[in-house]
Amino acid sequence: MQIKRWFLNNSLRNYQYLLYDKSHAIVIDPLKSDIFAEFIAKNKLQLEAILITHKHGDHIAGVKKLLAIYPNAKVYAYTENDLFKPDIYVKDGSFINLGFTSFRVMYTPGHIDDHVCFLFEQERALFCGDTLFNAGVGGVQAESADINQLYDSLVKITKLDGDIKPYPAHDYWLGNLDFALSILADDSYFNYYRNQVAELAAEDKPIVNLAEEAKLNIFIRAMSDKALLKALPDYSLGREMFVKLRQLKNNF
């Protein structure tokens, strides 16, 4: 299946994603229903599934309107929320075969306790919601957020094949790289990507694979990068370094 990406240019800088082939469509975390409905109608597709990574409003606001247009579409989510109940409750390791494609569910709490990611192995794509961002990770402001769970979820993602591409729900490239450079100012990867994305519209920013993400993401590098021991000598690599970086990012 092909992957269509839109940037909403709202205050949260949301990305929206749709997978499609000649006949079928899958929507991920719809905030704005109209862009999906227009594309599906124009290309004469059938909306088969709506996948929800977590229940924050900017990931579910468009679900009810899409279901009004496409009542046969099935909603997949870890838990219910204030707007709807899913047709199919998913859990860690759930494997869903839709016939025209399939996906596996990864339970990735930390940003919020109901967060999941959707791994499409054939498409080599991971829809990672607010767990992993380009050059960053999700925030831990929600009531059910847990910084240690977020670390464990990130570790789980880093164990996937390096050629898989993560598709995060927001464009936070610049802010994340600016934070990374505040810690490691001379780092070649941080500087390279900061220069690369500085002048790009969000729609044109690169979609990198996990192998490349591991080089440009300071939170992944917290697991093993000895350069961080010089920058933050009071903290050991791994969970302790990750937690410290996430705390510093909260106030950046």
UniProtKB/Swiss-Prot annotation:
Pathway the protein acts in: Secondary metabolite metabolism; methylglyoxal degradation; (R)-lactate from methylglyoxal: step 2/2
GO biological process, one term: methylglyoxal catabolic process to D-lactate via S-lactoyl-glutathione
EC number: 3.1.2.6
Binding locations of Zn(2+) 2: D58, H59, D130, H170
Coiled coil residues, start to end: none
Obligatory cofactor(s): Zn(2+)
Catalytic activity: an S-(2-hydroxyacyl)glutathione + H2O = a 2-hydroxy carboxylate + glutathione + H(+)
GO MF annotation list: hydroxyacylglutathione hydrolase activity; metal ion binding
Keywords: Hydrolase, Metal-binding, Zinc
InterPro entries: Clx_II_MBL, Glyoxalase_II_hydrolase, HAGH_C, Hydroxyacylglutathione_Hdrlase, Metallo-B-lactamas, RibonucZ/Hydroxyglut_hydro
Binding site for Zn(2+) 1: H54, H56, H111, D130
Free-text remark on how the cofactor is bound: Binds 2 Zn(2+) ions per subunit.
Pfam family, one: HAGH_C
PANTHER family: HYDROXYACYLGLUTATHIONE HYDROLASE, HYDROXYACYLGLUTATHIONE HYDROLASE GLOB
Function: Thiolesterase that catalyzes the hydrolysis of S-D-lactoyl-glutathione to form glutathione and D-lactic acid.
Family according to the record: Belongs to the metallo-beta-lactamase superfamily. Glyoxalase II family.
Assembly description: Monomer.
Name of the molecule in the record: Hydroxyacylglutathione hydrolase
Naturally occurring in which organism (per UniProt): Francisella tularensis subsp. novicida (strain U112)
